[in-house]
Amino acid sequence: MANRIYNFNPGPAALPLSVLEEIKENFLDFQGSGMSITEISHRSRQFDDVVNDAVARTKRLLGLEDNFEVLFVQGGASLQFCMIPMNFLGPGRSADYVDTGTWSTKAIKEAELQGKSIQVVASSEDKNYSYIPKNIAFNEDADFVHLTSNNTIKGTQWAEFPDTRGVPIICDMSSDIMSRPLEVNRFGMMYAGAQKNIGPAGACLVIIRKDLLDWIPDTVPTMLKYSTFAAKNSMYNTPPCFAVYTVQLVLKWLEETIGGLEKMAGIN
């Protein structure tokens, strides 16, 4: 393509040209099915292979063990702001939140709207979110700590994640997921709206430690339970097939063309 524009939008963000070319080549006839990826059944073998490959590549790239589920959930990261307290802050549970900008502020608001027990233990609002708080006094009895890894609007990022004294971190990584290796065992959940870094809008990658699924109250509506997606390989209802397929191709590019997250971090 002669005049491809450099795209610095925060989302939908740029995608690798080779991924777009592969999509173009296979768009009308996906894997010899005679149908487009936008037409095939999400119950088909072809799409089942897409999901399973995306899950496997996510696990390899991040070094995830079998105690993590990899899910594709709709609603972007913004819906997760609502789902996280709904799923993990049942009666008797509490969480610490760190406020570092627009997206963490929205996550805090969604928890507060539900009347959940949360504490904002640190904030950089006093200087217009121009820094990442240090020396945070986390509550040892908190069930999780919520962070936003990269604050696109304010331009700050956690270069190193804080010591939470063993409390699992739940982290919005929408704009820097797959950009660097992570100490994944420190996290209870990582989530990322695909359109920021790994695909088009429509899918949210959710990586969740399996034991957290046991925290979910029975009263949470079916489509707002992470356990619903885990039990059905992200296909309880019709998923955003095209978005998931594109994410799969980006993960393939990261693994096979770039050579993994160490290499990606070096490029970045």
Model-flagged regions — what are they?
Residues 4-55:
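A glycine-/small-polar-enriched, mobile loop at the entrance of the PLP active site in fold-type I
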Residues 7-9, 70-74, 97, 119-122, ...:
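General beta-strand structural signal in soluble alpha/beta enzymes
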Residues 33-80, 87, 102, 110:
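Conserved N-terminal alpha-helix of the aminotransferase class I/II PLP-enzyme fold
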Residues 89-105:
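Conserved PLP-anchoring active-site segment centered on the Schiff-base-forming lysine
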Residues 111, 123-177:
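Active-site phosphate-binding strand-loop segment of PLP-dependent enzymes
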Residues 170, 184-195, 204:
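Conserved active-site segment immediately N-terminal to the catalytic lysine
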Residues 194-267:
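Active-site C-terminal subdomain of aminotransferase-like
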